């Protein structure tokens, strides 16, 4: 018989840097989950990724206080900011452009994000990421 699910916890934790301090500790502690066990497992799973890159994680907590977790791909906005070499998006994206991204950069980001996107093919994923880039105030070349 399947275990009874007690809760889902959604967090963004930096790759390889999970520790018991907030936000991880309080979110897991109030559900009775072993915090250090999660931190060790998460850090082991994300050690191949760029350190410090925020990784969304969905933790499923069961009624017997055990857990499983699924890591997602980094947010598109973080990847776009890194590709454009900027620290933040534009406050007025329609009038003030803060950087440029090329189609090649968008394709690279789309390939990274593909498992989490609902796009049918790579071209649709590129258009989706291009829309995110435009809403951040980035100039999109070649799309």
UniProtKB/Swiss-Prot annotation:
Any GO BP annotation: translation
InterPro entries: Ribosomal_uL11, Ribosomal_uL11_bac-typ, Ribosomal_uL11_C, Ribosomal_uL11_C_sf, Ribosomal_uL11_CS, Ribosomal_uL11_N, Ribosomal_uL11_N_sf
Gene Ontology molecular function: any one: large ribosomal subunit rRNA binding
Key word RNA-binding present: yes
Record Gene3D superfamilies: Ribosomal protein L11, C-terminal domain, Ribosomal protein L11/L12, N-terminal domain
Family annotation (SUPFAM superfamilies): Ribosomal L11/L12e N-terminal domain (SSF54747), Ribosomal protein L11, C-terminal domain (SSF46906)
PANTHER family, alphabetized: 60S RIBOSOMAL PROTEIN L12, LARGE RIBOSOMAL SUBUNIT PROTEIN UL11M
Protein name: Large ribosomal subunit protein uL11
């Amino acid at each position: 018989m399947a275990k009874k699910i007690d809760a889902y916890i959604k967090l963004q934790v930096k790759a390889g840097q999970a520790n018991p301090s907030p936000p991880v500790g309080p979110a897991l502690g109030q559900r009775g989950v072993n915090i250090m066990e999660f931190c060790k497992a998460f850090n082991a799973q994300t050690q191949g990724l760029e350190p410090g890159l925020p990784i969304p994680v969905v933790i499923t907590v069961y009624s017997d206080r055990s857990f499983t977790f699924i890591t997602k791909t980094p947010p598109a906005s973080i990847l776009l900011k890194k590709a454009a070499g900027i620290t933040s998006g534009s406050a007025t994206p329609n009038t003030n452009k803060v950087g440029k991204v090329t189609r090649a950069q968008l394709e690279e980001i789309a390939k990274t994000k593909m498992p989490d996107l609902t796009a049918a093919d790579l071209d649709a994923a590129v258009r989706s990421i291009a829309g995110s880039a435009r809403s951040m105030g980035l100039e999109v070349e070649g799309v």
